[in-house]
């Protein structure tokens, strides 16, 4: 399988997806036809989100079609060489994808050679479940099971920092709560600017920041760029 799982879409001082474009270009391998799944978008319309994505990827020669715009979404997925899933609200993304019957076809197409690109909520969707999203559950997705393309759980936008005076839980504390009730899971705390690239059977960590892996009953393990999962 070929996956590019990004923690986020924007870095300070850079344009939207700017930091990801070289990664995407490197993994295209001649692929040009893409479908975009915009359902995580809530405060922007799906048309706006699709057009924005198409515009930024056009210089790479990628032709982007919004899955919500086609008459036969399953046929579009079958024909796609690239499947792109944007960030936003993960619960909304999973709900719409499940109700439209897209989860199994997307997973199957990626397993048969399509490149999967997802940022934030799109990275969450590639995991076994969405239980490590940071998002508010604004809708009920009728279950948390997701695409299960990547075997570990990802927590995107990971930071353990708290504003001065803030008394809420740290991100690690929230992840530890999950590991109490689901000790079989391993969770990757993927900070902004980092990514996981899967190609030729290898999953490799990239990015400038320390990534953390959390497992039940164990201390967090720090990982740096180049680590192979």
Swiss-Prot record:
Any single biological process term in GO: proteolysis
Catalysed transformations (reactions): Dipeptidase E catalyzes the hydrolysis of dipeptides Asp-|-Xaa. It does not act on peptides with N-terminal Glu, Asn or Gln, nor does it cleave isoaspartyl peptides
Active site (catalytic residues): 120 (charge relay system), 135 (charge relay system), 157 (charge relay system)
UniProt subcellular location: Cytoplasm
Keyword terms, alphabetized: Cytoplasm, Dipeptidase, Hydrolase, Protease, Serine protease
Pfam families listed in its UniProt record: Peptidase_S51 (PF03575)
SUPFAM superfamilies from the UniProt entry: Class I glutamine amidotransferase-like
EC number(s) on file: 3.4.13.21
Gene Ontology molecular function, alphabetical: dipeptidase activity; serine-type peptidase activity
Job of this protein: Hydrolyzes dipeptides containing N-terminal aspartate residues. May play a role in allowing the cell to use peptide aspartate to spare carbon otherwise required for the synthesis of the aspartate family of amino acids.
Record-linked NCBIfam families: PRK05282.1 (NF003642)
Entry protein name: Peptidase E
């Amino acid at each position: 399988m070929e996956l590019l799982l990004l923690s986020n879409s924007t870095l300070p001082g850079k344009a939207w997806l700017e930091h990801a474009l070289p990664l995407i270009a490197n993994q295209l391998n001649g692929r040009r036809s893409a479908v975009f799944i915009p359902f995580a978008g809530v405060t922007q319309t799906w048309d706006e989100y699709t057009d924005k994505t198409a515009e930024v990827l056009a210089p790479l020669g990628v032709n982007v079609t919004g899955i919500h715009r086609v008459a036969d979404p399953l046929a579009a997925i079958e024909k796609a060489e690239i499947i792109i899933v944007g960030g936003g609200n993960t619960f909304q993304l999973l709900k719409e994808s499940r109700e439209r019957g897209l989860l199994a076809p997307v997973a199957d197409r990626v397993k048969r050679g399509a490149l999967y690109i997802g940022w934030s909520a799109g990275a969450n969707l590639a995991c076994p479940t969405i239980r490590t999203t940071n998002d508010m559950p604004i809708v009920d997705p009728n279950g948390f099971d997701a695409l299960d393309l990547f075997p570990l759980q990802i927590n995107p936008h990971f930071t353990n920092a708290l504003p001065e005076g803030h008394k809420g839980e740290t991100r690690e504390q929230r992840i530890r709560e999950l590991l109490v009730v689901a000790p079989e899971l391993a969770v990757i705390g993927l900070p902004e600017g980092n990514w996981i690239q899967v190609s030729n059977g290898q999953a490799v960590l990239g990015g400038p920041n320390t990534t953390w892996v959390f497992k039940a009953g164990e201390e967090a393990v720090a990982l740096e760029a180049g680590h192979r999962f």
